[in-house]
């Protein structure tokens, strides 16, 4: 392995921030991988909830885009990207829509916490560029995503899932099926 040459563009970019960005890239790719697993679980012929599948596939693409945005930032700031192995999802069988939404909510809260810690690090290292980047591209979107998932969990519970397969089907058809026209 060759050592990376020093960057000409690096300025006020602490090594701790560079390392934290690489960890965040890994976490975003992990989240994308989890959502991809969820998507294709709901696409199975014995589950057949196509709008859950579409919803989680969209989430997977968003998380991958977040990772790519961080990679672009790393290069712009003169940092070096060091990719790590992406952990496989904790499960392959997501059981039902409520369980998957609860797992997704927990995942988004974890990603948000990591971003908040990255923002604190950037503040501590006096890096206004990184603070602005995180605020502009991530924090508000995370809060919206957490709220949306929380609403989905609440509605699925109120409808009586997972005991009621009909409720899950109706949520898939009417809530997730209508989200395309609202976006």
Curated annotation (Swiss-Prot):
A GO MF label: ferrous iron binding
Example GO biological process: negative regulation of ferroptosis
Stored SUPFAM superfamilies: Ferritin-like
Binding site for Fe cation 2: 63, 108, 142
EC numbers: 1.16.3.1
The keyword Iron belongs to this UniProt entry's keyword annotation: yes
Known catalytic reactions: 4 Fe(2+) + O2 + 4 H(+) = 4 Fe(3+) + 2 H2O
EC primary class: oxidoreductase
Record PTM N-acetylmethionine, positions in chain: 1
InterPro entries the UniProt entry points to: Ferritin (IPR001519), Ferritin-like (IPR012347), Ferritin-like_diiron (IPR009040), Ferritin-like_SF (IPR009078), Ferritin_CS (IPR014034), Ferritin_DPS_dom (IPR008331)
Family of the protein in this entry: Belongs to the ferritin family.
Summary of the function given for this chain in its UniProt record: Stores iron in a soluble, non-toxic, readily available form. Important for iron homeostasis. Has ferroxidase activity. Iron is taken up in the ferrous form and deposited as ferric hydroxides after oxidation. Also plays a role in delivery of iron to cells. Mediates iron uptake in capsule cells of the developing kidney. Delivery to lysosomes is mediated by the cargo receptor NCOA4 for autophagic degradation and release of iron.
UniProt protein name: Ferritin heavy chain
Organism: Felis catus
């Amino acid at each position: 392995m060759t050592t990376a040459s020093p960057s000409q563009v690096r300025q006020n970019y602490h090594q701790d921030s560079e390392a934290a960005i690489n960890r965040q890239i890994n976490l975003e790719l992990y989240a994308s991988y989890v959502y991809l697993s969820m998507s294709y679980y709901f696409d199975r012929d014995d589950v057949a909830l196509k709008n859950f599948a579409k919803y989680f596939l969209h989430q997977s693409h968003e998380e991958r885009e977040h990772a790519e945005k961080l990679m672009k930032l790393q290069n712009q700031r003169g940092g070096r990207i060091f990719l790590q192995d992406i952990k496989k999802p904790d499960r392959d069988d997501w059981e039902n829509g409520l369980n998957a939404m609860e797992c997704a909510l927990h995942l988004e809260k974890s990603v948000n916490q990591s971003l908040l810690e990255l923002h604190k690090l950037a503040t501590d290292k006096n890096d206004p560029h990184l603070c602005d980047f995180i605020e502009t591209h991530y924090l508000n979107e995370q809060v919206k995503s957490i709220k949306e998932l929380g609403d989905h969990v609440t509605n699925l519970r109120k409808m009586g899932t997972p005991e009621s397969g009909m409720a899950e089907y109706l949520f898939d058809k009417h809530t997730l099926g209508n989200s395309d026209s609202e976006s």
